[in-house]
């Protein structure tokens, strides 16, 4: 310890900087600094401390930590009582911690249920026990969890500016840079303005591009009604092929040939996303983890791969030949080419492409996997889908307008998104003192004070299964409910407010097109895994057992 203190004493604190942001100028009187007082205390007491055992020092240190926690909470409570925002707010129901200091019991339960693939069910059951909004304390940091649509509306819309992305930026930034999913404030506004024009109908309605990759997918699926096929992995490959085609004008072709470079990118992208998901799961312990060298290399492979396409797009803009010699992309519009017309910032283009690729691959694959999981267990729904497609399309592939008119098909999509939202749980962080409209008091209907720095967790998975919102059969797959009911903030598969998903129409169009073409191609679909649904939660939700089915051709 003496060595550490000596280093602190000798360190030139004026040399500190945060990237390009210089550190604040030190106080002119170093005697008033915390570091100086620590050093002075050590100089005075280091000799006397040598007589005490390590255990005694450890106990004293732990006691000091507990006292510090108690003092912090007392000061926070005093601040909360006197905050003008808190007038009218009532206490929030708290999770019944056994460890009231660090909240390790709460953390342990989360870790164990996650490993058992029951994390979302545990969250849902907690809401049923504690109420739709409750508080926790972990490592002396306050958190609020909610499945209340009014509170979620407040977080995402009404008081949108009161919240930031929290820890998402340091975790996802190494791969996604300054893209739309990892930016706040002006950076985020710039990203959204840059990307919005590229999700116009002309881009979203390119069904021929989807059909091209779907044809490759269908070639890999036996139609004899006897062979078992695992659809979940095929859907991931399909959405990666179609998303890269949509974004880069060049598909990875993971369902067919694919070059070695394309395959390397696909593998690196999957590894990078797994590493990001792991960091989110680790939470506060992420700082103790050694950097994963393979994951860091994967980040660089992904960014370098996309940079090659950005260079080609900029060359096309300036009338130069493609560095890759790819002639297939020059005559049609695609996302990257349009983006390159809007900005010269190559790093920004690369970052935005990687951000959209995550949504284009993972969320749509999650939806398709969950959709076919439930359809394989509801043959009567499958026959209704086939009947609607046959009546309205007469065996032809649908165009964009026809697709929009297939009401029962859309109801099946909505019902799947309700039960299995691709992003079932999300977080924000309060950037200032603010309030939630509900959750306080004995009945949970009074406003709640939210201090600056508080982590907000909102769980659409639990909200979508609330019987008071969706009826006593909320846990059941029943597409017919969408024929008579309309939902607002109770149904939130694509987020809401200013940050609502830009690509939701693309995802819905692609999923509906795939569903219709499958219904036209296969007479029956049968589940081949009798096990109940078990969650696999990474960045998106999937079935831990996959989607094993048998399909019989029409």
From Swiss-Prot:
Name of this protein: Cytochrome P450 monooxygenase himC
Protein localization: Membrane
Molecular function terms, GO-annotated: heme binding; iron ion binding; oxidoreductase activity, acting on paired donors, with incorporation or reduction of molecular oxygen, reduced flavin or flavoprotein as one donor, and incorporation of one atom of oxygen
Known glycosylation sites: 110, 328, 414, 425
Job of this protein: Cytochrome P450 monooxygenase; part of the him gene cluster that mediates the biosynthesis of himeic acid A, a ubiquitin-activating enzyme (E1) inhibitor. First, himA, together with the trans-enoyl reductase himH, catalyzes the formation of apolyketide chain, which is then condensed with leucine by the NRPS activity of himA. Dieckmann cyclization and release from himA gives a tetramic acid intermediate as the product of himA PKS-NRPS. HimG then catalyzes alpha-oxidation of the tetramic acid ring, with a subsequent rearrangement to yield apyrone intermediate.
Membrane topology per record: Single-pass membrane protein
GO cellular component, one term: membrane
Gene this protein is translated from: himC
PROSITE patterns per the UniProt record, alphabetical: CYTOCHROME_P450 (PS00086)
Major place of residence: membrane
InterPro entries found in the cross-reference section: Cyt_P450, Cyt_P450_CS, Cyt_P450_E_CYP52_ascomycetes, Cyt_P450_E_CYP52_fungi, Cyt_P450_E_grp-II, Cyt_P450_sf
Keywords annotated in UniProt: Glycoprotein, Heme, Iron, Membrane, Metal-binding, Monooxygenase, Oxidoreductase, Transmembrane, Transmembrane helix
Family: Belongs to the cytochrome P450 family.
Residue numbers binding heme: 501
Coiled coil region boundaries: none
Domain of life, per lineage: Eukaryota
E.C. number: 1.-.-.-
Broad EC category: oxidoreductase
Pathway(s): Secondary metabolite biosynthesis
Pfam entry (one): p450
Transmembrane segment boundaries: 52-72
Cofactor: heme
């Amino acid at each position: 310890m003496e060595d550490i203190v000596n280093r602190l004493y000798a360190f030139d604190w004026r040399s500190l900087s945060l990237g390009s942001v210089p550190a604040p100028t030190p106080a002119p009187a170093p005697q008033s600094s915390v570091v100086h007082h620590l050093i002075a205390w050590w100089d005075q007491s280091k000799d006397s401390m040598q007589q005490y055992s390590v255990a005694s020092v450890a106990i004293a240190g732990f006691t000091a930590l507990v006292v510090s926690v108690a003092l912090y909470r007392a000061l926070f409570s005093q601040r909360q009582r006197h905050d003008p925002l808190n007038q009218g707010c009532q206490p929030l129901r708290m999770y019944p911690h056994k460890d009231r200091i660090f909240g390790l019991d709460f953390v342990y339960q989360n870790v164990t249920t996650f490993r058992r693939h029951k994390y979302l069910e545990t969250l849902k059951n907690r809401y049923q026990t504690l109420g739709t909004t409750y508080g926790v304390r972990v490592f002396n940091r306050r958190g609020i969890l909610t499945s209340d649509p009014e509170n979620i509306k407040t977080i995402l819309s009404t008081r949108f500016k009161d919240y930031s992305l929290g820890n998402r930026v340091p975790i996802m930034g190494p791969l996604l840079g300054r893209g739309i999913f990892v930016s706040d404030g002006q950076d985020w506004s710039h990203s959204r303005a840059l990307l919005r024009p590229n999700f116009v109908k002309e881009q979203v309605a390119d069904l021929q591009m989807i059909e091209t990759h779907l044809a490759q997918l269908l070639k890999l699926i036996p139609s004899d009604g006897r062979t078992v096929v695992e659809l979940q992995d095929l859907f991931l490959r399909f959405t990666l092929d179609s998303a890269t085609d949509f974004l880069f004008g060049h598909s990875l072709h993971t369902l067919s040939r694919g070059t070695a470079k394309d395959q390397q990118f696909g593998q690196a992208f999957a590894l990078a996303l797994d590493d990001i998901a792991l960091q989110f799961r680790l939470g506060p312990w992420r700082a103790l983890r050694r950097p994963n060298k393979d994951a860091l290399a994967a980040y660089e492979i992904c960014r370098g791969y996309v940079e090659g396409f950005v260079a080609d797009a900029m060359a096309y803009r300036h009338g130069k030949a493609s560095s890759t010699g790819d002639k297939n992309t020059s005559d049609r519009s695609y996302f990257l080419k349009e983006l390159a017309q809007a900005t010269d910032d190559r790093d920004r283009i690369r970052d935005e492409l990687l951000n959209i690729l995550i949504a284009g691959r993972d969320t749509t694959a999650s939806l398709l996997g969950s959709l076919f999981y439930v359809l394989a267990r509801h043959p009567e729904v499958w026959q209704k889908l086939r009947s609607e497609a046959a009546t309205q399309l007469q065996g032809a592939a649908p165009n964009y307008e026809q697709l929009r008119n297939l009401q029962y098909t859309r109801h099946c999509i909505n019902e799947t998104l309700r039960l299995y939202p691709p992003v079932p749980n999300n977080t924000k962080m309060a950037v200032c003192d603010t309030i939630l409209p509900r959750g306080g008091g004995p009945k949970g209907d009074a406003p709640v004070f939210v201090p600056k720095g508080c982590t907000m967790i909102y769980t659409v998975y639990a909200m979508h299964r609330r019987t008071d919102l969706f009826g006593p059969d909320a846990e059941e797959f029943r597409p017919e409910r969408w024929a008579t009911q309309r939902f607002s903030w109770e149904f939130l598969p694509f987020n809401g407010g200013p940050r609502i998903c830009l690509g939701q129409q693309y995802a819905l169009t692609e999923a509906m097109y795939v569903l219709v073409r499958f219904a036209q191609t296969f007479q029956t679909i049968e589940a081949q895994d009798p096990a109940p649904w078990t969650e696999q939660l990474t960045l998106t939700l999937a079935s831990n057992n996959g989607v094993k089915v048998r399909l019989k051709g029409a």
